[in-house]
């Protein structure tokens, strides 16, 4: 008997999956606070990764190291990538006003609230979050 591989496609990678944000102290879901992100198998995420690989190859062809590791630059790049794969949110407010979903606001949230960024990174890194439930 064979198994249909189509059943194992992370079909939500390009559609986006919803992360329920968890309180950093109580570890309980914050009701209504969600962030919708694309998965690591999405076309956009794969294009971002290919761009990084191409940049490393270009550096090597110029006789430079593939990566000059700089923690600050890596952190900025990580946030840049997350901004590009974040496609929506609900329930985020700042100073008692709803926080509009814009790339600038996404960048601010991921920069100022590292615990949110870490939850998003972990969620994106888990392919299981991007499969539709069967049946």
Named regions from a protein language model:
Residues 90-135:
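C-terminal charged interaction modules
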């Amino acid at each position: 008997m064979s198994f249909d591989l189509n059943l194992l496609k992370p079909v939500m990678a390009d559609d986006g999956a919803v992360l329920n944000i968890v309180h950093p102290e109580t570890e309980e879901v914050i009701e209504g606070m969600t962030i919708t992100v694309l998965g690591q198998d999405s076309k956009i995420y794969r294009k971002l990764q290919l761009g990084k690989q191409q940049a490393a190859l270009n550096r090597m062809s110029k006789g430079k190291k593939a990566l000059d590791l700089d923690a600050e630059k890596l952190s900025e790049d990580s946030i840049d990538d997350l901004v590009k794969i974040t496609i929506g949110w609900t329930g985020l407010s700042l100073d008692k006003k709803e926080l509009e979903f814009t790339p600038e606001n996404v960048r601010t949230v991921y920069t100022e609230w590292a615990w949110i960024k870490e939850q998003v990174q972990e969620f994106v890194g888990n392919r299981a979050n991007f499969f539709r439930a069967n049946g």
